Structure formats: C-alpha cells, structure tokens
C-alpha cells in the first residue's frame, strides 16, 4: 500500500482501510481454494468460511465502495458541498439501478431465486468482473511478448537523440523570442495606454480603436504562432522521452537479465497465440470444455505413453501447483498494472476516488477469477464452488470470457500494429 | 526597444503544486484561468527592471522555464528533462503548503538540476543524499515559494510557516508563501514583491556583473562563518 501512495498523500484513513479489507478478503478466497485442494480443515467449516467470505465481499463491493466513491466524487465538486450525503445517496441509487439493469440481457436469471439473494448479486458482479478480466488478459496477452521481445525494438542511435534535442531547444528559443515581442508590445501599450486610456466619450473610444488596431492584430497573430510552437514543443518532448526509453531498453536487452526476459518473451508469445487459438475454437465450435487441462493432460500422457500413473494422486498435486501459479501471477500482474495506472493518472484531488475505484475493480476481478478457476480444477474440487455459488450458468461465463478475450486481443494487436508503424515513419520524416 | 539581455531561471517542483499558475502570475500579473497539466516544458518571459529606482536601472528579460513532471520518474524521462537544465542562472523551487511530500521532494529536485549544471570550479560530488554544505557553496541563486496558502486554516498557519522557514534556511534561500489565485500577494511594494525583485537582481548580477556579485557573496559567507563560530 505504501508503494501505491508513495508520491501522493491519501489522507482519508477510511479509504486505506477499505482498500486493505477488500484485498484481504479477496486473498482469503484464494486461500480457501488452496485449502480445498489440499484438504485442510473440515469440509463443513470450509463451506461456512466460503459463505461468510462471499457475503462480506459482496457487501463491500456492492454497497460500501460505490457509496464512498459517490461521496468522494461529490466532495470534489465544490458546488454541492452542502448536501454531500444526500447527493452521495442519489449517486448510489443510480448505481444500484444500473447494476440491476445489467442483469437483464444476460441469461442468468432463473425464476427460482428471490430478489436479494446471493446468486443475483454474484451473477451481476461476475459479469462485470469477467468482462474486465477478459479485457485485461486480452491486452496483456498481446502486450507481454511485444514488450519482452527485442525483435520489436527500433534502432535508436545517440545521434538521433541529439538531433531531436537540438530541434526541441530551437523550438523553445523561437517561443521565447516571440513571447519577448509580445511582452514588449504589452508593456509599451500599457505605458502608452496609461496616458490615453480615459475614453472621453464616443470620439475617445474611436481614437483608441484606430491607434491600437495595428498593434493588436499583430499581437494576436504572434500569439497564434506561439500556441502552434508550444504544441510542437510538447510533441518533440514526448518523442525525445520515447527515444530515451527505447535506448534504455536496448541497453537493458544486452545484459544477461535482458536476454533471459527475451527468451521468456518467446515462450509467452507461443502461450498467448495458443490461448487465442483456443478461444477461437471454443467460439466457433460452440464447445465448453468439461474436463480440466490437468486431468486431460495426464490422461493423454497415460494413453499415449503407456506409463503407469496414479492419476488421482498426481492430479491433485499438479492442479494445486498450477492453480497456485495462476493465482499468484494474476494477482501480481493486476497489482503491477494498477500501480502503473495509478501513477499515470493520479493527482492530489482525486486520489481518494481512484483508490476506491481500484478497490472495486480488484474485488470484482477476484470474485470472477474464482468463477473461472473452477474450469481448471479437477471434478472433485469443483463441487464446493458449485455449492457455494449456487446455480449459476457457468458455461455462459466461460463463453462470455472467450468472446471478450478474443475481441480484446485482436483490437490490441491492431492498436499496437498501428502504433508501431507510425513511430518509424515519424523518424524517417526528420 | 533595444535588444534586452537574457537570463534563464528554472521553475521546479512536483506535479500539481502550481508552477504554471505561478509563472503566469509572475509574467502577466493575472491569474491563470484554466490550469492544465504541463507536458514537457513551458516558457514565459518577464520583463524586470534591474536596480529599479536607481540611476543604474536597466531592463532585462527573465525567462521562466516551467518544467513539468515528477521527481520519481523513470531515468529516461529524467534524461529528457535534463536537456532543459543547460546554462541556467537561477532556480525557483515551488512546493505546496498543504502537501508535505512536495516540500521534501524539493531536495531531490534541486539536486537533479544542480548536478546537471556543474561549473568547473564548484563540482558537486554527491551520491544523491542531501548535504547542507553543498547549498552553502552553491553559486546559483535559489528561491523557495510555497503555494496554496489560502487552503491552510488559520490555526495551522504558524506551524506550517515555521517548517517552511527551516526549509528555506536549508537551501540558503529566501522564501515566499502565497496563493497563486490572488494577485494581491505580489502587489508592488509588498514584502513578497521586494523579495522577488531582490532575487531577480541577484540572478542578473551573477550573470552579468560577476565580480561585484562575487565580492558580495564572499563577504556574506565570511559573515556567516564568523556567526557559526560564536
């Protein structure tokens, strides 16, 4: 937490508490999954803990966090300072309304359940969370190999950087000289205007218009030029920063660590391509896998290689390891992305709102990853999740995830391709 | 008008402390209506009368370079910013009175700017830590400005002002505390305006009248050393 708030002070203690609580409960959920696999604790007590955990998390996600978000947004707008609570409640009710409406177009409502049951809430939270997860993983799946592999790095020499810096400084000098002219003109007008600036009736005004019209026209022209030059200087600055960053990456890739990451990048890219491929197949052939990868993998090995395996024993351990890895990497990836995002957009005014938004996103993300993890676990462990979460249409969620994942991956490929193409063209034009 | 001589002053500080508003106030005597984030560097020009009111009065342009960014940026951004630190004649350090972190970051800002511009005689040997002696020997005039004074409630004002007084002493610099949305603080004749004018005079003097400045500088140092001995 300290890392997130290193440069900006988030004064409100409440915000910090809420964030930590959300995070803590989400992690507890994952711990419960692991306990499930390992067989720790009594079965009924596990069930109880699951229920308790879910209730608390849903309470926080659906009731408390949105309310506080509304409260802080309203307190940022100076106009509505008086009736903060009232407006916060209004915002919260709007949120609940939209939240409810969200459920309508999806086939998740079954007539058996009442209005305020856990299943309803989870289904909606699940939809939002799954969408988010799919977007993030789609983008991550494409961005990861792009960042890691040095194949994509453009070649940047010191001369390029120096040339660009020189252009930047020249632009700044031009801006300065123009601003000097404006300042001098203003000063002389001010000094002259002191004498003339008593509009003695109609004629005085006409005289002041004709004497200064030449000066002011010139000034507005210069001002426009200055604005254009400032825009140019901003662009040049961003390009220079980009070049410096690329140069740093090139140097980093020459070290051992860089080479190691490069190697990983190749692996990752194969994995990502495979995932995209699987998603396409799932959608095209309209099939949702019944058995999890681990058991299938072991079955295939046993059948093809004819090795005598104690399937149950090994499947338990392997699935435990796999699930553990998935959990850890997804938590780590999420936190890193959140930290970067937070640095990029935070300011001292809105840091409270942003922290709460992040807590909300994180909570939804974790709830839905529990939903989806069910897919990767062997049959006997699935039962408890199915029990706890009630009768949700799990298949729907998996399909929805695949669709959004595919869409997000394809659009991020397109986006990165365009960005990559644009940059070398800009440098050619220099 | 004849070509006026040029002087470069950097305006440094964390994101959102009010550097752009401050620069606008200093140069146009008007409050900035719609402050937005500064990307890269924005420059503005202030016409300053050196030694106003004396027969030696001469007009100079002072360029205020307002560099945006945060002190914890990646090395690539820092090296990009470093291109603006060439040949500077003075530094204005801006911090937010309501945000303690921004005052603490001023040390790192000043080190970043001063390490870049190393004069052949006054080499700053540093490993990034702050050392008061360096600022005593520092030949580039500094000024510390605290903004958002209006947002501090009356009860806390004294405590905040003592803290900033210590800060300014550490930098061996003058300090001004004001609110960038109110031009009253820099009205002609107020003590703030006098301090500002003195600072700009010091910058110009160091740039153009080195001998005169040097003798004054050495005299003040000798005075301070004598004080410390007692």
Swiss-Prot record, chain B:
GO BP term, pick one: regulation of protein lipidation
Positions binding GTP in this chain are: 16-21, 148-150, 179-180
Q: What keywords appear on the UniProt entry?
A: GTP-binding, Nucleotide-binding
Q: Which InterPro entries match?
A: P-loop_NTPase (IPR027417), Sigma_54_int_dom_ATP-bd_1 (IPR025662)
Purpose: Required for KRAS signaling regulation and modulation of cell proliferation. Regulator of KRAS prenylation, and probably prenylation of other small GTPases. Required for lymphocyte development and function. Not required for myeloid cell development.
Assembly, in brief, is: Homodimer.
Q: What is this protein called?
A: Rab-like protein 3
Q: Which organism is it from?
A: Gallus gallus (Chicken)
């Amino acid at each position: 937490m300290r890392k997130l708030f290193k440069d900006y002070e988030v004064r409100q203690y409440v915000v910090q508490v809420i964030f930590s609580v959300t995070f803590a409960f989400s992690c507890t959920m994952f711990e419960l999954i692991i306990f499930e696999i390992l067989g720790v604790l009594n079965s009924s007590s596990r069930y109880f803990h699951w229920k308790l955990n879910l209730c608390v998390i849903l309470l926080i996600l659906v009731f408390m966090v949105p309310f506080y978000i509304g409260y802080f947004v309203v307190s940022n707008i100076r106009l509505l300072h008086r009736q903060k609570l009232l407006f916060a409640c209004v915002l919260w009710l709007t949120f609940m309304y939209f939240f409810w409406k969200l459920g309508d177009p999806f086939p998740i409502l079954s007539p058996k359940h009442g209005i305020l049951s856990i299943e309803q809430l989870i289904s909606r939270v699940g939809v939002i969370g799954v969408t988010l997860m799919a977007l993030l993983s789609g983008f991550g799946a494409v961005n990861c190999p792009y960042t890691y592999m040095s194949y994509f790095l453009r070649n940047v020499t010191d001369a390029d950087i120096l040339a660009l810096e020189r252009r930047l400084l020249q632009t700044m000098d031009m801006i300065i000289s123009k601003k000097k002219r404006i300042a001098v003109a203003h000063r002389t007008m001010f000094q002259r205007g002191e004498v003339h600036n008593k509009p003695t009736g109609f004629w005085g005004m006409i005289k002041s218009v004709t004497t200064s019209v030449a000066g002011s026209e010139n000034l507005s022209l210069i001002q426009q030029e200055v604005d254009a030059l400032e825009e140019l200087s901003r662009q040049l600055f961003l390009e220079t920063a980009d070049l410096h960053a690329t140069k740093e990456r090139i140097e980093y890739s020459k070290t051992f660590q860089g080479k190691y990451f490069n190697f990983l990048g190749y692996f990752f890219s194969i994995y990502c391509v495979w995932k995209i491929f699987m998603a396409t197949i799932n959608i095209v052939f309209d099939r949702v896998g019944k058995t999890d990868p681990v058991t299938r993998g072991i079955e295939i090995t046993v059948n093809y290689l004819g090795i005598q395996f104690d399937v149950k024993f090994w499947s338990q351990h392997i699935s435990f390891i796999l699930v553990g890895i998935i959990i850890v990497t997804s938590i780590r990836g999420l936190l890193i992305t959140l930290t970067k995002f937070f640095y990029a957009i935070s300011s001292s005014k809105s840091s409270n709102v942003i922290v709460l938004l992040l807590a909300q996103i994180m909570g939804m993300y974790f709830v839905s990853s529990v939903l989806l993890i069910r897919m990767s676990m062997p049959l006997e462990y699935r039962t408890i999740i199915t029990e706890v979460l009630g009768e949700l249409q799990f298949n729907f969620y998996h399909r929805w995830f695949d669709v959004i994942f595919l869409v997000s991956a394809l659009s991020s490929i397109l986006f990165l391709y365009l960005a990559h193409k644009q940059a070398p063209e800009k440098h050619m034009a220099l | 008008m004849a070509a006026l001589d040029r002087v470069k002053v950097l305006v440094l500080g964390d994101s959102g402390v009010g550097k752009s508003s401050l620069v606008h106030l200093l140069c146009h005597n008007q409050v900035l209506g719609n402050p937005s984030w500064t990307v890269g560097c924005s420059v503005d020009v202030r016409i300053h009368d050196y030694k106003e009111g004396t027969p030696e009065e001469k007009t100079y342009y002072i360029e205020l370079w307002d560099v945006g960014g945060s002190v914890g940026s990646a090395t690539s951004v820092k090296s990009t910013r470093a291109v603006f630190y060439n040949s500077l004649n003075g530094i204005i350090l801006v911090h937010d009175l309501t945000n303690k972190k921004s005052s603490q970051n001023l040390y790192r800002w000043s080190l970043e700017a001063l390490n870049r511009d190393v004069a052949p005689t006054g080499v700053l040997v540093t490993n990034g830590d702050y050392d008061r002696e360096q600022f005593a020997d520092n030949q580039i005039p500094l000024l510390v400005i605290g903004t958002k004074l209006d947002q501090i409630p009356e009860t806390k004002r004294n405590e905040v002002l003592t803290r900033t007084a210590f800060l300014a002493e550490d930098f061996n610099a003058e300090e001004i505390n004001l609110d960038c949305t109110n031009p009253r603080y820099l009205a002609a004749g107020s003590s703030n305006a006098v301090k500002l004018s003195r600072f700009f005079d010091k910058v110009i003097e160091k740039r153009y009248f080195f001998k005169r400045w040097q003798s004054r500088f050495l005299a003040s140092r000798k005075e301070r050393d004598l004080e410390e001995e007692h």
